[in-house]
Amino acid sequence: MGGRRPCAGRPPTGTYVIKLSLDFVRGQFPAFSEPSLRDWSNFDNAGESYACRYVIWRLHRTYRERKVGPEGAFPASERAAEELHDARRRVALILGLGIDEVAFGPSTAQNAYVLAQAVRDWLRPGEAIVVTEQDHEAVGAPFRRLAQAGIEIREWPMDRASGHLSQAALERLLEDGKVRLVSFPHVSGVVGEINNVKRICATVRRAGAFSVVDGVAAAPHGLPDIGALGADAYLFSAAKAFGPHQGVMALRQVFARRLPTQAANGASEKDWMRFTPAGLDHAQISACAGLADYIDTLYHHHDKSGRDAAGRAQAISKAMRAREATLMGPLLEYLVGNRHRVRLLGPAQARARTPTFALDTGRPAAPLARRLAEHGIMVGSGECHAPRPLRALGVPPERGVLRLSLLHYTSEADVDRVIQALDAEL
């Protein structure tokens, strides 16, 4: 992305992957010392993650010391403005972006809606966009509504057995040259497969189109180097990635500058403000710097190499994925071994997916979720805002799925516990 900071000075990582200390990781999350949560195992992380202590501390400090407008000529205001700028700068750096390529909004759903409205103003009737059958409705639906403006909507279909999005199917959708934009998920929240974002974005660019990536279900499992992925837009929710209630939207400048401003005054010249019609939540944005604090704390505890911010973030992302792969092993083995009792949607190989498991038992999922709660297991259930992929895979959305999701802070004991609970209730 334009304005990206160089990575000079970052040593090669080779095959070395940091091994995270579970005790140290959990020590960064106040939820693990909260008495009311002590007897629970959290497998509803796809709904929302616990917040790290740095985010909580920054949010509390802002409300206590700096809850003033950031444009004043007095010390509290100057500190508020400084912290707001620092949060934007540090979040951009850990994502491999320039500071003006990161925008914030109340949620990813809101950011997607605003972006879709900008695309609506940009495209002409008869031009086409591609959406997918894997879409989460919060991101996919606003783009589908562009049909009302005469934009042709093409759907990238899933394989009906696996949920996979094939490269060949995408290329067929692009071959007539009418497509201007492709919106797709990095990971579907019910299929769980990790899509090859770098390859897809390169294919889209060769076709003369722009790419919009829904990263909500991917970012909690390791923040991406968005600049390296080649996405023109990348959206994720900080609330699902250890942070506050903010949507983060990366926009490559060559794409952003083609889009009409959506700012309230219609005339903002700042790239990062052009897609924020509701104004800024200063406290929540400032607290996003806590994500960088957390990554740096993990990195410096486990490794002393002299990497830059993006390098530290990628080293920790690899460490998170490695730990999650280890945790997935026993659970995947159990699910595959019990195919006669439960169907796992998406791949059964840890290397191909994130640890978010949508399970179909052939019965309504909500009662099973309530029974698991009696075992001290927190899980999600229902259609998970993903009725399209569920229908495509033969699961009625009204029946729904049981959704188990773990993160790098999940313990081996938690995994054993959920397996025992599933075995008792399936």
Q: Where are these predicted regions, by residue range?
A:
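Pyridoxal 5′-phosphate
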Residues: 14-426
